[in-house]
């Protein structure tokens, strides 16, 4: 087994109780640009797992923050974080410090991709379809609905369907179908409480230090 293939075996805190996990990952120091560059160079050129471990642990807070953005899909946040951590490890494995940008910038794509694939699998989008347009709808419909029709349940109005289809460059019927499917799936997944009610999510909030 090559050294780089061992990155998936790096030890990171277990995502059990979320508040405990968040407290644990705060203990890992953030890296300045120079330190990050040297660690990434050492990992890329020498396969130094200690360097890779520092790169991973210093970005666990980033994963947690990104994962919180997907909690509206009714899935356990600890599972979202675990999936995001896998994406982070892939980012570290492929990161080239000579490209001139920071690891966080590069890792965000991998983290989001890993979490999104998990959400798609969990929501059984195989039945809904997994075209580019449908994925775009799935991950943007709720946000746009909250912008143009906050708090509205049920079918969208014609003008709302038109607005969403224009913003996302998809067909109107796709908007209608996805909205109905997501509403039905939310009920089966015991979706989070509605906007304005936060009690059920108190234990899942990231503190301000992640902003």
Go through the PLM ranges and name each one.
Residues 1, 157-162, 166:
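Short, charge-rich amphipathic segments
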Residues 166-177:
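Short, basic interhelical loop/turn and adjoining N-cap
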Residues 2-128, 132-151, 163, 210-211:
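Alpha-helical promoter-recognition and RNA polymerase-docking modules of transcription initiation factors
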Residues 8-12, 146-160, 173, 191, ...:
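Acidic, proline/glycine-rich intrinsically disordered inter-domain spacer in sigma factors
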Residues 123-139, 179-211:
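Conserved alpha/beta core segments of nucleic-acid transaction machinery
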